Regions:
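Short hydrophobic beta-strand element within catalytic cores of glycosyltransferases
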Residues: 330-333
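Nucleotide-activated donor-binding/catalytic signature segment of Leloir-type glycosyltransferases, i.e.
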Residues: 272-293
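Short alpha-helical donor nucleotide-sugar binding micro-motif in glycosyltransferases
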Residues: 180, 292, 300-305
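Aromatic "clamp/platform" in nucleotide-sugar-dependent glycosyltransferases that forms part
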Residues: 313
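Glycosyltransferase donor-sugar binding loop
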Residues: 234, 259-274, 291
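Donor nucleotide-sugar binding/catalytic pocket of nucleotide-sugar-dependent glycosyltransferases
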Residues: 60-64, 134, 165-220
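A conserved mid-protein helix/loop that constitutes part of the nucleotide-sugar donor-binding site
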Residues: 20, 229, 238-252
Length: 407
């Protein structure tokens, strides 16, 4: 059994996002490997509460490197650039802890697992004579600037600047470059990451989406026969999620049988703006505003609706898209970002990133097609079963172990 030292800043059971992603990787890898996991201490109680009950828990050894509550708040306040200074310091201390572990324990592989963003590769790569694996690596997508047309000046400047900083950093950041070239194996979270690493560093990587599926039981196909056609939208009302584009697509269908169920919320201004747009488009009666709901409510809704309508234009691999597949729900989204590696014509439909007006037309056309051809939806739903298995956490872990063994 291979012994793997994993750097996972955020790791916790029963959570989504980065903590849940790292936990699911670790808990599945532990079926095949002995893991030594260095993580921040925020979720220590949660980890230690569930670990004894896991059959593979004996293969999971946690080492905690805690930070202050103030730094934790910076971490989860997206956009707080002050966090990166403290995060780098955390990575250095983790490196020192890792060196100590390696002196007392046999380690076959060093794995930089999360956070997935490419800007912070940590320092495990500096440890000699042990193969270093980095990934899944994310954060390398370029925001499609054609979709900034209706954005405010601040949003336009932020995204254009971020695009340019991303390119500069992947090309010129010394530590990122050193980590990439020291790695025995690189894993890209999405095709955009693969292309950037190949283009700017001339290195190969393997594409494995950072999040995975949980196989579900068989679900009745009767929901696809309902006269009312429900499309489901889930997310924050922030700019990259493109809720206004979804609303305009519903209006463009000119089909009163199509209902859009919106799960999620935003600030007062975003909520008012979204509802005002629905009124201006004359589709108030076709939109149901559910607000923020517990995950179990969202999952239950996925098992009853007809299509998952995902309009985000800047994601790595969104957990909610994988949740749709887990619930046998066909997906309509852009052929971009993490979705491009997950959704194909067997389980849904994608449209190309072009410009907002073209996208509205393309989405509307596809929604009308789905509304008319319920057998197509049934087929996509049935195909989700095989896709679940391909994208399952268990399958990802086996894939990773095979790569470890070749490293």
């Amino acid at each position: 059994m291979l012994s793997i030292l994993i750097n996972a800043y955020a790791c916790s059971p029963n959570m989504g996002s980065e903590p849940g992603m790292a936990w699911n990787w670790c808990v599945n890898l532990a079926n095949h490997c002995e893991l030594h996991i260095i993580t921040e201490g925020e979720f220590r109680d949660k980890i230690e509460a569930v670990l004894p009950a896991l059959p593979q828990g004996k293969n999971m050894h946690f080492y905690y490197n805690p930070v202050s509550e103030e730094i934790r708040k910076m971490c989860w306040n997206q956009g707080d650039w002050r966090f990166y200074k403290y995060y780098r310091e955390w990575q250095w201390k983790t490196y020192e802890m890792a060196k100590d572990i390696c002196q007392h324990t046999h380690i076959d592989i060093l794995h930089q697992l999360n956070m997935v963003g490419f800007r912070e590769p940590g320092y495990l790569w500096k440890i000699p004579k042990i193969p270093f694996v980095w990934g899944p690596i994310g954060g390398l997508k370029q925001f499609p600037e054609a979709y900034l047309k209706d954005a405010g000046l601040k949003m336009k400047l932020f995204n254009k600047l971020k695009n340019r900083i991303n390119i500069y950093q992947i090309k010129h950041d010394k530590r990122v470059t050193e980590a990439l070239h020291h790695a025995s194996l690189l894993i890209s979270s999405i095709p955009d990451s693969y292309k950037s690493i190949k283009k700017y560093q001339h290195l190969e990587s393997v594409i494995i989406p950072e999040t995975g599926c949980f196989p579900s039981e068989d679900l009745s196909a009767e929901r696809f026969d309902s006269k009312e056609f429900h499309a489901m939208w889930v997310g924050k009302f922030d700019f990259r999620k493109q809720l206004p584009l979804a609303l305009r697509a519903i209006a463009e269908t000119k089909n009163h049988n199509i209902i859009l169920d919106v799960y999620g919320t935003g600030n007062e201004e975003q909520i008012f703006s979204a509802k005002q747009l629905a009124a201006e488009l004359g589709i108030e009666k076709q939109i149901v505003w559910h607000g923020n709901q517990p995950n179990r409510i969202v999952m239950d809704a996925m098992r009853k609706t007809q299509v998952f309508f995902f309009t985000s234009i800047s994601e790595d691999t969104s957990t909610v898209v994988l949740e749709a597949i887990s619930n046998r729900l066909p997906v309509l989204c852009f052929n971009a970002c993490g979705m491009a590696a997950v959704i194909d014509k067997k389980v849904g439909q994608t449209v190309e990133l072009s410009n907002p007006q073209q996208s509205i037309y393309d989405f509307a056309t596809t929604l009308n097609c789905f509304e008319k051809d319920r057998n197509l939806l049934k087929e996509c739903s049935q195909n989700c079963k095989a896709r679940q298995q391909e994208l399952s956490w268990e399958n990802k872990a086996k894939q990773m172990v095979e790569l470890y063994q070749k490293t």
